[in-house]
Amino acid sequence: MNTAKPWLKNYPAGVPAQLILPTQTSLVDLLDESFARYPKRKAIESMGHSFSYEELNVLSEQFASYLQSLDLPMGSRVAIMFPNVTQYLIAMLGALRAGLVVVNVNPLYTSRELEHQLNDSQALVLVLSENFAHIYQQIAEKTSVKRVIVSSLGDLLGPKGLLVNFAARYIKKIIPQWAFPHTRFTDALQLGKQHLFQKPTIDPNAIAFLQYTGGTTGVSKGATLLHRNVLANVLQTDAWLEPVLRDQHDQQLVFLCALPMTHIFALTACALLGLRKGGLLLLVANPRDITGLIKLLAKHPEVNIFPGVNTLFHALVHRPEFSKLKLSNLLVTIGGGMAMQKKTADHWQAITGNPIAQGYGLSETSPVVCVNTPLIEKFTGLIGLPLPNTDVVILGEDGKRMPMGEAGEICIQGPQVMAGYWNQPEETRKVFTVDGYFKSGDIGFMDSEGYVTIVDRIKDMIVVGGFKVFPNEVEEVLASMPGIHECAVVGVEHRKLGEIVKAYIVKDKYDLTNADVLQFCKEQLTSYKRPRKIVFVSELPKSNVGKILRREVRKLGDSSS
């Protein structure tokens, strides 16, 4: 156990070193408190339509009741695949309230990626947006799923929803054709209304989420997050923000939810923390629509809390119309998911007057581990201090603690750390030290004041716009393509996305083209995993035992041979 915790002396006044965390409380109990305390408050605004806490309570209970009517065993997995719309929150909360396990699915996934996640989790139910139904249809017969619930984006928007759905299908034509047995989301709610909801007793040690993350082998693994893990991280983050929020207790906080809530950062820092605080969640279904996001911010200058990633902040500050906004109510801007660039952070503060407090976390830690104090006056470039109840040590390759200021692997112990990887005991064993610290796989160092800095990443992980990409997965896909003899994938710097994927290919088919490779990858990989640059070479550098040396591959440049 680490007894030296230099970060504690730098905690803001009012933030305790140790929180007294509830031992008999589930995440559902925490949410029920908010439903009871704030029934008339607005909980959600999505696509111009709002829902109160009372309405969210009723709708999520109806969905929970519907799930119970399916006679699923407690702990069954429910996969959910939505952008940031009200249906996601209803399905997620409903599954938790029914005593089931939420499997968040990236809505950008290809059929191959979706198939793996559904089968690995053994999900019995899939709830998804109609926009992605054609993706599931391609692998429907290959999965463990027994029941599919499909929703159109406009389903809960009243009369306006009819127009939204009509436009999506027949004007914008963004809904590809699909056909398979399913239940409509609205029908599920009606069926749930007819079924008496039986509130289950949920053990805090029960699984709440299987949050899938890449592994060092490139195989996507489910981080097993218990109710007590996620509950702890919500309470830790709440306590950490208290110094800037303590004067707002009588006012409703407004959270901008631009990051996808299927991602662990937004799930905790936007959705669950927002509901815990009785906040209003402004849902952004398409954060790539920067013009639409700026219009939303113009309509809601009262935004108080803005979690984001560097690419989002970068896109906003480079729009002239963003600089005209008056975001004087902005209390906290949290940067996570990828490294923040100082130029972007400084530009953000110059426009908004609010510094970006950079943090650090992982899917395996629910996610927040470290974050800068929200009282900072300017961007620091550091990932901040460990949260209350959290211990961080820097270990060398020999497993021994590194001296202050020297780099090693960031290792974490705390109530937010996962129980392990779903059905992968050997992989779980690899990522924990003998005394119970989670080995993050990231290289960093801690200074004498307890501030942590990220230096580099172990292995060769690539971070594209905040999303982790593992070269082995991309290489495996490329290697399966006829005409490719060998390949190696590396990350290269990119001004907007941080990094992009670059592939070096040795071909055994002379007429293989860049376009051929890009089309193949489009069918097999979600967009951020696809190579943006492709270089054909005659051979790849290897070690004396035949291992491709990525560090040497990076030196090859852009010249094809």
For each feature predicted by the language model, list its residue ranges:
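Conserved AMP-binding/adenylation subdomain of ANL enzymes
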Residues: 231-254, 262-304, 319
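AMP-binding/adenylate-forming catalytic core of the ANL superfamily
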Residues: 109, 126-130, 298, 414, ...
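Conserved structural elements of the adenylate-forming
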Residues: 57-62, 190-195, 223-247, 313-314
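Conserved AMP-binding/adenylate-forming
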Residues: 45-51, 64-112, 130-131, 258, ...
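Conserved pre-ATP/AMP-binding loop-to-beta segment of ANL
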Residues: 175-212, 219, 244-254
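Conserved beta-loop-beta connector loops within the AMP-binding
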Residues: 360, 379, 393-411, 430, ...
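Conserved AMP-binding A3 loop
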Residues: 52-54, 208-235
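Gly/Ser/Thr-rich phosphate-binding loop
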Residues: 279, 303-308, 317-378, 391
